[in-house]
């Protein structure tokens, strides 16, 4: 059995436990350590100053970012065909500003105190989670890919809401180790997606809230085609089944970074009424994404290959 196979078996049982390796100090990683040092310094810079720095950096680089920008343009053209080029470019530039503000704030999220992070957060609709807990339900949070998705997951822990989630390990072991330490520092468990869904569901049954990302494209075989904004999307249909297996209600939540208030906002909606029909269940999920994203499209991760799987097999994204 290979080391990677052993690791998957261990994480399937207990969740990922990050461990330090002396190889992380190899000179090839010194650039990463330098970047970490800069982020840790920025953790103590007032957020308004840091956000201004991030905005200037983003606007300077926005037009130089090739493939991610092209993917965002393709996604927005299909989802909002009535938009002008000016509208689309404005959203993309604002998105890159949001990216930079969130990225330069990673150090703050990773090392500042629980009390500090609580002050930097705001909930809209928290009563929906409180009510579900009071009624004795397990909870799966259905969380679309907003740029503040990792920050909000960590912040939820500080408010006494431990999370369990599935993730794709980073290709660099040092980055994977550091970021998993940050994600788990207040509790909760991360599970490698390669282990399947059972470890994730097991921790939900134990009382942790599931942090489920619904909008990646996993191909036609695992998906159904349902409407997504003005186009369609290969969407995973198993949310209702997952909720039943975990004996949980599904509560939609969307994370945003509000640069005006300097707070990470988490908007929470009432529990979803999911259908037994896979297509109706998948469409209900996309409707929640549309509700969250439409008023603040710059907060959404448009650079993903969200629409990769097309009915006619067309490859819409450049290599």
Please report, for each region that a protein language model flagged, where it lies by residue.
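Non-catalytic C-terminal accessory region of glycerolipid acyltransferases
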Residues: 2-10, 16-19, 26, 89-93, ...
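Membrane-anchoring hydrophobic helices of lipid-metabolizing enzymes
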Residues: 2-143, 176-178, 187
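Short Gly/charged-rich anion-binding patches and loops
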Residues: 37, 71, 127, 151, ...
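Catalytic core of membrane glycerolipid acyltransferases/transacylases, capturing the structured
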Residues: 101, 135-194, 206, 220-233, ...
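General small-molecule cofactor/ligand-binding pocket signal
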Residues: 122, 191, 269
């Amino acid at each position: 059995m290979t080391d990677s196979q052993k690791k998957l078996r261990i994480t399937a049982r207990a969740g990922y436990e990050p461990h330090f390796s002396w190889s992380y100090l190899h000179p090839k990683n010194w650039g990463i350590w330098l970047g970490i040092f800069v982020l840790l310094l920025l953790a103590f810079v007032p957020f308004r100053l840091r956000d201004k720095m991030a905005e200037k950096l983003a606007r300077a680089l926005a037009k130089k970012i090739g493939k991610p920008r092209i993917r965002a343009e393709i996604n927005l053209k299909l989802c909002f065909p009535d938009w002008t080029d000016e509208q689309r470019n404005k959203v993309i530039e604002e998105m890159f500003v949001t990216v930079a503000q969130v990225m330069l704030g990673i150090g703050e999220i990773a090392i500042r105190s629980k009390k500090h992070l609580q002050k930097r957060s705001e909930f809209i609709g928290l009563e929906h989670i409180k009510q579900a807990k009071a009624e004795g339900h397990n909870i799966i949070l259905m969380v679309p890919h907003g740029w503040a998705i990792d920050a909000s997951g960590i912040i939820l822990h500080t408010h006494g809401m431990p999370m369990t989630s599935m993730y794709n390990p980073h290709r660099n072991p040092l980055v994977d180790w550091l970021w998993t330490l940050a994600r788990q520092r207040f509790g909760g468990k991360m599970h490698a997606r390669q282990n399947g869904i059972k470890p994730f569901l097991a921790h939900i049954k134990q009382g942790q809230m599931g942090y489920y990302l619904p909008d990646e494209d996993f191909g036609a075989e695992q998906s159904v085609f349902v409407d997504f904004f003005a186009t369609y999307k290969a969407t995973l249909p198993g949310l209702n089944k997952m909720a039943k297996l975990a004996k949980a209600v599904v509560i939609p939540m969307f994370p945003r970074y509000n640069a005006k208030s300097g707070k990470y906002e988490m908007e929470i909606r009432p529990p979803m009424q999911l259908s037994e029909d896979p297509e109706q269940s998948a469409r209900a999920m996309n409707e929640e994404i549309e509700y969250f994203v439409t008023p603040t499209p710059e907060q959404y991760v448009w650079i993903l290959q969200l629409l990769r799987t097309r009915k006619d097999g067309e490859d819409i994204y450049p290599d």
